[in-house]
Amino acid sequence: MAGTQACSATRFSCPPHFTEMSPDSEPSRFSLEALTGPDTELWLIQAPADFAPQCLNGRRVPLSGSKTVKGKLDGKKHRYRVFTSSPQAREATLLASSSEAGGRLTCAPAPSGSLRIMEGPQEYLLSRVPLQLIPTSLPPQIPAGLRPRFSAFGGSPPVTGPGSASALRSPTSGKRKSTRKGTDASSDTQEAVNRHGAMEVKTALGNLGVSVKKRKRYFMQEEMEAKTMEPVAELPVPSATSSKKRKKSKGTETSQVEHTEPVAQTEPPEGTFLFPTKKRKRQKEADGTEEVDGIVADSQPQVIVEAQEETILLSPTKKRRKEKRQNLGMEAEMGPPGVLMVTEHSEHGLQAEVALVSPKKTKKKKGKRVGETEAALPDDFEPQGALAPSKKKERGARL
């Protein structure tokens, strides 16, 4: 049975692309004893068929990574690319002859790594074949009839031309403006209602369609009228002259108050009822004129401003007529309750007083007689000043 098993065992057959060699009697350098030495390492090298190991004599080969190695053989330069890799388990199994086994092949230890040698691009090929240039990318070209759009998604497209301003305006812009105007008008009318407390103003202005500026002016005019009406209610005689007349009257008021001697109207105490006559006037010219001077000093602040402004613009003849009318009207009104003592100075009487009495003595007498007149007058006395003749009359009387 054993013989039959031995006869049936197949012999080792040489694989394809390998040649069978008979072992030499001399020990080979790839014997098992040489490979297992302490100073030797076993590396598996894979190279092309036409590779000549002599071209890499004296060259350093990397044991990790990859490197391009140049070699020279028979005057020709060769370039090889060497790749190294660590051995893997059961990647390759080496069989070596052993002298101990009588020259038979035995399994050798596993190699330390593997080297793969590949042919690189040769220099003569690189020098002869020109390199192909990579074309640079051209900038994008916009075809004719198209326009670039540099706006975000949902934005309005750019519009050029005369109609750009109208096209850019959104259809809702007019509505917004109208609503804003409506809110402004309503706020103005509400303020007016709060100030004056009248809801009719809002409805009237809204129906007329007055603009906002006109409404503001209307309300400002109402405020000014309300302010001006307050002092009118307190004063008995409002001033109706213009601004120009007021400016002229300011300069002349001081001079007229000093020089003029207006006619004083007095009310005597109850029980005496006297009528003004020419005889009494002439009798009391000497004594009454001095008393009138004291009364005039007290009645000067109550001179009516409006009458003074009117006398500046009137001629002297018209002034006299107007004074007579005023005196007659005042006498008609004040006639029944009491008697009005009107003192009028004639030109001859004034000239006589100026000639007899010196100005220094009159000043001293005025201070004394003012106190006498105040004591003689009743408690209810209220002097009312009327307008006196103009400056021309006074100058003529003093001359």
Curated annotation (Swiss-Prot):
GO cellular component, one term: nucleolus
Localization per record: Nucleus, Nucleolus
Residue positions, PTM Phosphotyrosine: 80
Sites of Phosphoserine modification: 137, 173, 299
A matching Pfam family: RNA_polI_A34
Positions bearing N-acetylmethionine: 1
Signal peptide positions (record): none
GO terms under biological process: rRNA transcription; transcription by RNA polymerase I
Keywords: Acetylation, Nucleus, Phosphoprotein
Function, as annotated: DNA-dependent RNA polymerase catalyzes the transcription of DNA into RNA using the four ribonucleoside triphosphates as substrates. Component of RNA polymerase I which synthesizes ribosomal RNA precursors. Involved in UBTF-activated transcription, presumably at a step following PIC formation.
Protein name as annotated: DNA-directed RNA polymerase I subunit RPA34
Source organism: Mus musculus
Gene from which the chain derives: Polr1g
